[in-house]
């Protein structure tokens, strides 16, 4: 059952803290030379990104309120996609993924026309709108899934597209590292406990 508006930071898409997650795969965790994987690795990576993430906290909170999205999920995606703008994330003038994806949340230019500066409110708003579109697509594709599973499926779709989210059990099967939604959810849960 969904908690009230205030308990979920105004998020209407589900309750982040009630979503099950296995966290980062060993492949994803190896970015930081972690010998651990799973939720613990996701939490460590989120913790490592917190100082940089806090530079964008005001924007994240503003966009989250306007879009009725959990700010911790936005932070989780930013952490996964660009390590909150880290130099080591491979960003060059805001571009990553071999010049195909733009900004903190890596909007793919092959499917969307990137808006704003790479670290701007306009960019985070656009990327959050894309996420919401994918959550709604998963809600339509899988109407029998719980609201929280649809939320998690939308996060997977943000990475791989809704057509590549094929089942509840294989939600991450076609995502980068085969762990995108699980890793983002685990990072987001950490950010939720740390001010987001």
Predicted regions: what is each one?
Residues 61, 65-102:
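Secreted/periplasmic proteins that engage bacterial cell-wall peptidoglycan
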Residues 57-58:
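N-terminal post-signal-peptidase region of extra-cytosolic proteins
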